[in-house]
Amino acid sequence: MESMVRETLEFMRGLSHREPAQLVDIMALLESLQADNEAMGRAVAIDGRVTRPWTGAPQLLKRCLSNLVDNAVLYGQRAQIRVEEAPDQLTLRVRDHGPGIPDSEIEKVFAPFYRLEGSRSRETGGTGLGLAIARNIAQAHGGDVHLRNHEEGGLEAILALPWKLA
């Protein structure tokens, strides 16, 4: 219950308490996220490298990625993070190996408090705010989060961010 109240308040507060933008070592942030998850016995793999810093709010980005990784581990047992560096944007793909979701539900799951009927259980927990928070953080940085069912199975969350805030 405490977690649900905390997440609801965070969502309602939005990004009004934004931390200042700074240069962020993406690989260090991802490795920290990986270590945090491994300490909890959760499998998170990182594939790819970023050679330049990203400009943004590191704690907000970590929260965004944590929400995506939490979903991947919760519904697909493990998370694979693929890092892609392009001249105009940084792309982080978080893939799970679970059942995916119906295409008709892909945009709906970004709505606050929306949960797929099959995901409502005591084991999975959650408030239905994780993806809404992740998308809000991405959009506050000029980017976005999209979902797609991966052709080899599972769900892939694609976080695309410009290198610098506008």
Task: Tell me the role of every PLM-derived stretch.
Residues A43-P53:
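Conserved catalytic submotifs in the C-terminal HATPase_c
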Residues G142-G143:
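Conserved glycine-rich
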Residues G125, G130, A134:
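Short alpha-helical Gxxx[C/S/T] motif in the catalytic ATP-binding
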Residues R78-D88:
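Short beta-strand/loop element within the Bergerat-fold HATPase_c
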